[in-house]
Amino acid sequence: MLQSEDIDGQCINCHHYRNYKTDNMQFHVRQLKGGTIIVNGDEVKKINLKTDSTISAGVYPAWHPTHNFIAYSINDTGQSFHTKNNNKIEVQDLKSDLILYDIDRNEVSFIEHDTLEWEVFPAWAPDGKTLYYNSAHYEIQN
């Protein structure tokens, strides 16, 4: 078991499991020692999904139900803090795309990459044949 105290209290979030089992899972560690931890059977590795051509590292994950793939949205996010309730924080995406991480090959490829579309929240169909996600058209009007 990993606890945030093991990594100096840093944020651990966005846990995701293949088929709700702990044999295959992933989670993100944020800040200085950040990265994505992938558990694939007995193998545990830390990866960085940020490349020169991506907006960010992986954000919102979705394990393929049968293959060693994880779809991620990659997002440029911002936070808004409420003045009336200091504990309430809103997060919004400023940009987003979708990538596919091939665990066996350690390769990242784009699923969607369009500056006028925001793609987020990937989810595989139970049979793994279809990847669903939210998409919103974004264009600044003059």
Residue ranges, per PLM feature:
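Preference for long, solvent-exposed alpha-helical segments and helix-linker "stalks"
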Residues: 1-35
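Multi-bladed beta-propeller domains
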Residues: 1-10, 39-57, 99-118
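Conserved beta-strand position repeated once per blade in WD40 beta-propeller domains
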Residues: 14-17, 60-62, 121-123
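Residue-level detector of Asp-centered blade-edge/turn motifs that repeat once per structural unit
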Residues: 19-21, 65-66, 126-127
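Residue position within the beta-strands of beta-propeller blades
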Residues: 24-28, 69-73, 130-134
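Short, solvent-exposed loop/turn and secondary-structure capping segments
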Residues: 28, 37-40, 81-85
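A detector of repeated loop/turn-to-beta-strand junctions in beta-rich toroidal repeat architectures
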Residues: 33, 93-97
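Short, conserved, GDST-rich strand-edge loop motifs in beta-rich repeat architectures
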Residues: 72-93, 134-142
